């Protein structure tokens, strides 16, 4: 999914364009965990060395390397907002089946169908389907940590389902955060720095609630402002 969602670093594309075979930087790179606001704003930590959310869905020319240019950050694209997808439904059914709910079907089949549907859904936004062929989908679903194994423990199965559901929810960060809070999966790296004084990275603390509306804070102040909820 990475080429669909994220842009290659500008340094990587520049090296390709210039025929630089000595480039050793990352093709896709995220911002390093632990940077403060000042460090994030430094030129050496900018988009030249880090990916932005402009993959094949938003700016196909950049990741397909057909006409890479320096105006990558000025692109404007309108994509539909996903409320609930078939892939998410399948993965919810996989979890329900694993927990013994009636009528949820087979856990493993729901899991595999959810991944397949999620990948197809992401490609549906492409202007040219050939930019992201499904050639390697089966390998992705049947190897490594993604592969379904009936002999795994219940917790291992829950982790696989939760991780794939988290991926399927992108870019709905709020729901993905809520699912991670609910299930405990995927296992995310602890925050190493926080600009919020209420979050202590030393204790592996993370965001526990989102900001409530003013009406909620006024009418339900005790619960809306409680640090324990």
Which residue ranges define each predicted feature?
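Acidic/polar-rich alpha-helix caps and helix-coil junctions
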Residues: 3-229
């Amino acid at each position: 999914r990475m080429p669909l969602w994220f842009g290659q670093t500008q340094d990587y594309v520049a090296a390709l364009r210039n025929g630089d075979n000595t480039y050793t930087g990352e093709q896709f790179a995220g911002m390093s965990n632990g940077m403060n606001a000042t460090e994030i704003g430094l030129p050496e930590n900018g988009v030249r060395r880090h990916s932005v959310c402009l993959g094949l869905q938003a700016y196909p020319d950049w990741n397909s390397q057909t006409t890479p240019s320096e105006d990558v950050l000025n692109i404007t694209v309108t994509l539909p907002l996903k409320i609930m997808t078939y892939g998410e439904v399948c993965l919810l059914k996989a979890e329900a089946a694993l927990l013994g709910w009636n009528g949820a079907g087979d856990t493993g089949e729901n899991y595999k169908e959810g991944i397949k549907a999620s990948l197809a859904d992401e490609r549906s936004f492409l202007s040219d389907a050939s930019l992201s062929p499904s050639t390697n989908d089966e390998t992705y679903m049947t190897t490594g940590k993604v592969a379904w194994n009936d002999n795994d423990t219940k917790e291992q199965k829950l982790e696989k389902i939760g991780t794939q559901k988290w991926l399927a929810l992108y870019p709905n960060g709020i729901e993905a955060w809520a699912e991670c809070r609910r299930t405990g999966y995927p296992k995310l790296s602890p925050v190493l720095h926080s600009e919020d004084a209420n979050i202590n990275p030393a204790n592996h603390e993370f965001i526990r609630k989102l900001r409530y509306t003013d009406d909620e804070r006024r009418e339900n102040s005790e619960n809306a402002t409680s640090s324990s909820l």
